[in-house]
A protein has these predicted regions:
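Acidic-enriched catalytic cores of C-N bond-cleaving enzymes acting on peptides and small amides
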Residues: 25-33, 200-209, 216-227, 232-241, ...
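N-terminal Sec-pathway targeting helices
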Residues: 1-13
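Acidic/histidine-rich, surface-exposed loop or edge segments in extracytoplasmic proteins
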Residues: 51-65, 245-248, 383-390
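Acidic/histidine-rich catalytic neighborhood of metal-dependent amide-processing enzymes
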Residues: 143-144, 148-231
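An extended, acidic, His-containing surface patch that forms the Zn2+-binding/catalytic region
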Residues: 41, 92, 103, 109-110, ...
């Protein structure tokens, strides 16, 4: 017994030593950089042009015939008038009907180009519930309001403002800069970004990196961190929706069978909602902990420095919040349900749609197979809907592209920490995977807990200070891209 106690004590001391040593070696990944150079801008004019851009109802649709074609054409004309230097000095191509590709030739053709992305299309918006009408572009209370203020006309306009400013200053980049603006990102990007990427591949273009919209500077959202955090997406989740359908005899509601069509589908949905996909601390989430863990208090730092031991506890904690749960597993959510024609008629048919967002490492085939196993109901027909996207590859952080974004962010948003992370939504950037391994998703505007609902929701807005800073960010990024 005494010998066993000595062995246990030795193991405890050794384990404690390993934990403490790993924690001590868990040092900061933040960097110190000189401040950005001065950039004089006319803030009122910047805001006015963004407000005007928001007024165009550039709503995309899966059906090209229903897209706002005239609005996109009018928006193109507006951009040409608003940015005369861009119009005269950059080559512009219209791709896939309404998407735009600008080419800004660099001095050194041996350097790989950089591609900056945004999209001009927006999701629909109803007038009710908005403080300012969704397509008013109102400038009020220190914000620009309207659909597209956050997603994603602010990014598009800020890129063009930055390039226009640099052109006026006579700046010529060392490497070629591409500006790619899709017109159907909200419905998959297959006629816009996909066509642009196809064109660049045909021209044998290989990119140094791609920067698209994505994660933001979050404030008050990450537990254990009081400072703002700039989250740079290094991967995004996959996407697939499944239609679950069943056919029965139907009949009169006074003589129901043991299992009705609605009951069969409802039972399947209950099984799916109560059977979660396996949780994993995947590459992007681990990288985020590597960058943020050293900035936390000792206990949090100790846990994150020793994921080999504390990963189960951390995953359990993350699973408590929908926001963090989405970062550790493939998620499933019922989004549509169709059944019934009257209150006294048993519907012969019932169907539902469930939307899945795939964690990197999971595949569409694998998650569909798991859905079948969980439902375990041969009467239900499971059909994947056409819009499908596998999870993206994970971009590395030890690359010039990520380091450039990190350096620029610390120059423009010096009060923020920075960390790579997983984007749980989908962007047009995935279409460029064949042109570079370095794809990043980051829009440096500040988002608090109350702002997350504004994406695709009511009262979408961007702070005037954030928009001016966004213009400075893109201008500094282009300058920093010099070798």
């Amino acid at each position: 017994m005494k010998r066993l106690a000595c062995v246990l004590l030795a193991l405890t001391v050794t384990l404690s030593g390993v934990i403490v040593l790993r924690t001590v070696r868990f040092t900061s990944r933040q960097i110190t950089v000189p401040p950005a150079g001065e950039m004089r801008v006319d803030t009122a004019a910047l805001l006015d042009r963004l407000a005007n851009a928001i007024q165009f109802r550039t709503i995309s649709s899966l059906d090209p015939a229903r897209a706002a074609n005239e609005e996109f054409e009018r928006f193109h004309e507006f951009l040409s008038e608003a940015f005369p230097q861009v119009r005269t000095q950059l080559k512009r191509e219209i791709i896939g009907g309404h998407s735009l590709l600008y080419s800004w030739p660099g001095r050194d053709r041996a350097l790989k180009p950089v591609l900056l992305m945004a999209h001009m299309d927006v999701v629909p918006a109803v007038d009710g519930g908005w403080r300012h009408a969704p397509f008013s572009g109102a400038i009020a209370d220190g914000y620009v309001w309207g659909r597209g203020a956050m997603d994603d006309k602010s990014s598009l306009m800020a890129i063009l403002e930055a390039v226009e400013h640099l052109l006026r200053d006579g700046f010529v980049p060392a490497r070629t800069i591409y500006l790619a603006f899709g017109h159907d990102e909200e419905v998959g990007g297959h006629r816009g970004a996909a066509k642009i990427a196809q064109l660049l591949r045909a021209r044998d273009v290989q990119l140094e990196f791609v920067l698209d919209e994505g994660l933001n500077v979050v404030d008050g959202i990450i537990p254990g961190i009081t400072a703002p955090v700039a989250l740079v997406g290094i991967a995004e989740k996959g996407y697939v929706s499944l239609r679950l359908a069943v056919e029965t005899a139907g009949g009169h509601s006074s003589v129901p069978p043991a299992r009705t069509a609605i009951g069969i589908i409802s039972r399947a949905l209950h099984r799916l909602e109560t059977t979660r996909f396996r949780s994993r601390l995947s590459g992007p989430t681990r990288r985020m902990f590597e960058f943020l863990g050293p900035e936390m208090n000792w206990l949090n730092k100790l846990a994150l420095a020793n994921l080999w031991l504390f990963a189960p506890f951390i995953k359990k904690q993350m699973a408590q919040s929908p926001l963090t749960n989405a970062a550790i597993r493939t998620t499933l959510a019922p989004t549509l349900f169709h059944a019934g024609v009257a209150d006294n008629v048993l519907p012969a048919n019932a169907s539902a749609v469930v939307n899945l967002r795939l964690l990197p490492g999971d595949t569409i085939a694998a998650v569909v197979a798991q859905v079948r196993r969980v439902i375990s109901e041969p009467r239900i027909k499971i059909t994947p809907l056409p819009l499908q996207m596998e999870a993206s590859p994970v971009s590395e952080v030890a690359t010039p592209g990520f380091e450039l974004i990190q350096r620029t962010t610390h120059q423009i948003v010096p009060e923020a920490l920075l960390a790579p992370a997983l984007l749980v939504a989908a962007t047009d950037s995935r279409h460029y995977a064949g042109l570079t391994k370095n794809i990043f998703r980051f829009l440096p505007i500040t988002v608090g807990p109350e702002d997350t609902r504004r994406y695709h929701g009511t009262d979408e807005r961007i702070a005037a200070r954030d928009y001016e800073r966004l213009v400075r960010f893109y201008a500094q990024l282009i300058r920093n891209a010099e070798p």
